[in-house]
Every structure is written in C-alpha cells, then in structure tokens.
C-alpha cells in the first residue's frame, strides 16, 4: 500500500535493526485519513472471506480494526490487556509476549461476543514474532469460531511471525512488508 509505505518512509523512525517507531501516525498519534485508507484496503482484501467479526488487541490495533469494521459492516472486538470490573464472566483468554514492551500479559475477550458461528478477521498494527496473532487465534478457537485471516498493517518480515502463520495455513495480508531495518533504513519487501 503506497500511502502507508510513504508514511513509514517519511515519519517512521528506525530505533534499531529490530524496532520501527510509527507513533506519529499509527500507535500514539493517529492519522485518520490513513486509517480510513487502511480500513478500505483490508475490506477490499477480505471481501470474499465471509467475515462476521473483527478481533484485535488493545490499543494500537483498534483504529485500523474499527475502520475495517465500518467498511465491512461488522462488529469489532478488542482483546483487553487489563481486566475491568465489567468483565465478570469466564473469559476467553491467552498469554501474549510483547516484543517492543518486553512484557508478558494476558489478553481476554468476553465469550458473549464470539460464537461458533463467527468467521473472524484478526487485525493488528504489527506482525513481528507472531505472539499477539497466536494469542488471538487461541481465543477465537476457544470460542469455537474460525479464523478468516489476518490483516496486518506493518509486517517485520525478518522476524518469524509470518512464516509460522503461513505454516499453520492462515491467510495473512500485510499492507507493508518490511524486509530490513539495517543501518537505520527501512527496506520494503
């Protein structure tokens, strides 16, 4: 997606050969026009997938997920990282390790929002080692639902997440595939 590539080139900051900072438009400050384009593109890519719900993890996946949900006409559910007083039932949950935050947390979704009839699209801001995606897949399976595919805004192809998801037979559509961050330069695949 050229608009996303341009934004990454112009406003992304390479912090190391493993970390790309995109807080100017995706995961701190949000560019609504770009999010609309991202949502439109995910809706186009998964138009034939029979999606009934979209699932993401709070917080950075919410904006692209909502835009895709708006375009596709389906609800968006975000897995919570922190339990709320309003979440009192037995939750669907999984443990996830965050590469950038270097912390493990439990993410959860109320079972009232997913059923075995659902065909779920996972949307997330980044795909690195695939741990967040695997946690969401686990939650979806706990509900008896099926995974329609994964929509990733930025994939760090040099980390192993994509290969693992491909090996498991999941459809993965990434809008920007970063091949390398070596030398402080973003190289797209």
Curated annotation (Swiss-Prot):
The keyword Cytoplasm applies. Xanthine binds at residues 20, 27, 156. Pfam families: Pribosyltran (PF00156). It catalyses: XMP + diphosphate = xanthine + 5-phospho-alpha-D-ribose 1-diphosphate. SUPFAM superfamilies: PRTase-like. One of its GO terms (molecular function) is xanthine phosphoribosyltransferase activity. Pathway: Purine metabolism; XMP biosynthesis via salvage pathway; XMP from xanthine: step 1/1. Keywords: Cytoplasm, Glycosyltransferase, Purine salvage, Transferase. Its EC number is 2.4.2.22. InterPro entries: PRibTrfase_dom, PRTase-like, Pur/Pyrimidine_PRTase, Xanthine_PRibTrfase. GO terms for biological process: purine ribonucleoside salvage; xanthine metabolic process; XMP salvage. 5-phospho-alpha-D-ribose 1-diphosphate binds at residues 128-132. It is found in: Cytoplasm. One of its GO terms (cellular component) is cytoplasm. It is an enzyme of class 2 (transferase). CDD domains: PRTases_typeI (cd06223). The keyword Coiled coil does not apply. Homodimer. HAMAP family: XPRTase. Belongs to the purine/pyrimidine phosphoribosyltransferase family. Xpt subfamily. This is Xanthine phosphoribosyltransferase. It comes from Pseudomonas savastanoi pv. phaseolicola (strain 1448A / Race 6).
